[in-house]
Structure formats: structure tokens, C-alpha cells
Amino acid sequence: MRQAEFDGKGSCIRWTEATGAEPARVYVHGLGSASTVYNAHIAARSELAGRRTLFVDLPGHGISDRPADFGYALEDHADALAAALDEAGVTAAELVAHSMGGAVAIVLAHRRPELVSRLVLVEANLDPYPPVKAGSSGIASYTEEEYVENGGHARVLDKVGPSWAATMRLADPRALHRTAIGLVRGTVPTMRHLLEELTADRVYLQGALSGELVNREELEAAGVRVVTVPGAGHNVMFDNPDVLVAEVAGKV
């Protein structure tokens, strides 16, 4: 396990790492998740062997610290991720990023383009104030006090089911709520616009069971390769890992 300070006050973002050839692959998890749980089985596949691999837990999640005075906006998470990559000596990384982690990865690539050579985005959040879907956590519908102090966190853990709750319960409730609020608020310009403007190689995976990706044609016109993953919902890495592995390996 390695760590890097991210807030100037001693709080650390942490990751586990496997040695290998550059460029490094960096796996970034979604809201209430953890990198190794969602990605270790992907990185372990023979098609992806031999590359330096980092499994990063964002602030407030997994093994990383969760300071109460941190903002947890997408930009804050991106800066913390940059601190981890700087400490690790990583540049021109390939980021494999899921959901909220995909939004963070887009912001990172915009703010620190030298750190990112390729984005493999798995149902990344692209737009602010998205419509509420079945299976969403609903965290942002609570005030911070309701969520942290008045039972909101427990209700959400019951709602999301045992698999998501298994990692969500490891996240700090206050950090989780602020992260959810930051995700709903998004960025200015939007994550979608930032993604369209990037020059790095970009792949976006959309689970077929999640429906059509909004404004897919505009993304493709901007050079983003959009892949619909058969038989998969939001968690492509569990529903159809073969497609994700092939895309990460660049063998499609």
C-alpha cells in the first residue's frame, strides 16, 4: 500500500500497486465503491498482464482518509488523484474509470493532461443533474445533516442492496454525501464538454441494459469511441468482463 497527502493537512489518498511495464494503468472506482473490489479481477486477466497497475481509493472511500473539512467536489477528487499519481511518478497513464470515477478521470485529464494518455470510461457520469434512475443511491436527495446524523446513510445502505452496501459502508457518510452532491452538481463546463475537448484516446462503455447513451453521436463526432456492451448494466466489469478486458487491452 502506498499513500500521498492530498489536502495540505496530512490526510492521505492510498492505493495498492502491482509492478510492471509503463504506461501504468490506473483503476478509479465509482461512488461508494473501492478500486480493488471492482477491478482486481479485470487487471488479473492474462490479456492485461505485465503492466504497472494502481488501484486508487478516492478520498472518503476504501483505505483513503476522510477529512471532515474537505470539499469532495469532482475537482477535489481529481486533485487528490493527481497527488497520488505525482507521488507514484506516473505520467501518461491509462485510466480505467467507472461511473463517478469516470467523471473524476475526465476532470483530471482536463486539469493535468500530462498525467493521462488514455481514458477507458465505464458508464461515466457526463451531465449535471441527471434524471434519477432505478438503482441510483439517492444520496443527494438528503441534506448533509439528514444523511449523516438522521438515518439517511442507513436507509441508503438498505436501499442499494448487499453488494453495493458492502463497499459503501466502508466510505465515510459525510464524504459520501458531499461527493454525491458534487457529482450531481457536475462541473462548468460539463464533464461531457470536457471529454469532447480532450486529445487523449477516449473509449466510453455503455451497458446495453442501461439504454442508449444520451447524445452519443456528438461524442463520436468529437473522437470518443462509444461501445455498447451486450448483456451489461451499470457494472460492466461484473456483467460482461470480457468486453471490458478487450477494451482495456486495446484489442478490439
Give, region by region, the residue ranges found by the protein language model.
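Catalytic histidine-centered segment of alpha/beta-hydrolase-like enzymes
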Residues: 232-245
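Flexible "cap/lid" loop of the alpha/beta hydrolase fold
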Residues: 106-111, 115-147
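Conserved serine/cysteine hydrolase catalytic core
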Residues: 174-230, 237
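Gly/Ala-rich beta-loop-alpha elbow adjacent to hydrolase catalytic centers
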Residues: 97, 101, 105
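Conserved HGGG/HGGXW glycine-rich cap/lid loop of the alpha/beta-hydrolase fold
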Residues: 9-65
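Active-site loop/oxyanion-hole signature of alpha/beta-hydrolase fold enzymes
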Residues: 9-11, 49-96, 246
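Conserved catalytic-core motifs of eukaryotic protein kinase domains, centered on the activation segment
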Residues: 37-39, 64-70, 130-133, 215-216
